[in-house]
């Protein structure tokens, strides 16, 4: 078990959406294969949440813009003396390939949105207890089909997200690795700094401190207030060391 815990906080709406998409796709993959009612509901609930997030904006356009922006950044890095040119070229190729695949793919989420079973389950999830067998006989039948049939259908659903997921994974890896962790110290539970056009804050705390950060701000400036997990009996030290990366 790790002695430290990592917190990530988006500094703009674009990054907030991307982190939610990443989280939901991870949740969808967590309990596969689907072999029982509970894991099915976990999967379909996350599919519904993912479609809700995707429908709020033009995810593909934002990802394509970011893929292009990352290519320009790498072009600048390529001119730095002593840089690993092979590594730069490899990442640039991945960015170009991901952009080509994403541009050629259907609208993000369209395949899931048009699926009849997903649509039926999505409607019933908003009703407390609305996914009983008498409410959703189609799901009841689906869960009694062979595991191979269910696996094949889930594979198609997950595969439809792959162009977006590949682009998103590549972008988030580059963002997360764009800045190192540096030791910082908060005074009386408070810390603030300039964002320097960052998209994402990454913060590491000792698990033994039993503290969590409340973060507010945007790409230009941010503030962090540390709060005790036990709000009644916990306390925050006058000086607290932590690790911070502005990515």
UniProtKB/Swiss-Prot annotation:
Keywords: Cell cycle, Cell division, Cytoplasm, Septation. One of its GO terms (biological process) is division septum assembly. It is found in: Cytoplasm. Pfam families: ZapD (PF07072). One of its GO terms (cellular component) is cytoplasm. Disulfide bonds: none annotated. Gene3D superfamilies: YacF-like, YacF-like domains. Belongs to the ZapD family. HAMAP family: ZapD. Cell division factor that enhances FtsZ-ring assembly. Directly interacts with FtsZ and promotes bundling of FtsZ protofilaments, with a reduction in FtsZ GTPase activity. Interacts with FtsZ. PANTHER family: CELL DIVISION PROTEIN ZAPD. This is Cell division protein ZapD. It comes from Enterobacter sp. (strain 638). The lineage of its organism: Bacteria, Pseudomonadati, Pseudomonadota, Gammaproteobacteria, Enterobacterales. The gene is zapD.
């Amino acid at each position: 078990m790790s002695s430290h815990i990592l917190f990530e906080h988006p500094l703009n709406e674009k990054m907030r959406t991307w982190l939610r998409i990443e989280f939901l796709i991870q949740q969808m993959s967590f309990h596969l294969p689907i072999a029982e009612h509970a894991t099915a509901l976990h999967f379909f609930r996350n599919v519904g949440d993912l479609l809700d997030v995707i429908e709020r904006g033009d995810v593909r356009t934002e990802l394509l813009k970011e893929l292009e922006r990352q290519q320009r950044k790498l072009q600048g890095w390529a001119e730095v003396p002593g840089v690993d040119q092979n590594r730069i070229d490899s990442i640039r190729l991945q960015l170009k390939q991901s952009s080509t695949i994403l541009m050629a793919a259907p609208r993000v989420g369209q395949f899931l949105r048009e699926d009849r079973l997903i649509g039926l389950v999505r409607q019933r999830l908003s009703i407390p207890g609305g996914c009983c067998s008498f409410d959703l006989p189609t799901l009841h039948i689906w869960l009694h089909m062979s595991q191979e049939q269910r696996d094949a259908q889930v594979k198609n659903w997950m595969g439809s997200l792959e162009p977006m997921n590949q682009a998103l994974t590549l972008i988030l890896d580059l963002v997360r690795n764009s800045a190192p962790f540096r030791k910082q110290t908060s005074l009386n539970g408070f810390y603030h700094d300039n964002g320097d056009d960052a998209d994402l804050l990454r913060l590491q705390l000792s698990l033994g401190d039993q503290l969590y950060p409340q973060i507010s701000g945007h790409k230009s400036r941010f503030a962090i207030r540390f709060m005790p997990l036990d709000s009644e009996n916990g306390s925050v030290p006058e000086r607290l060391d932590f690790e911070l990366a502005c990515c």
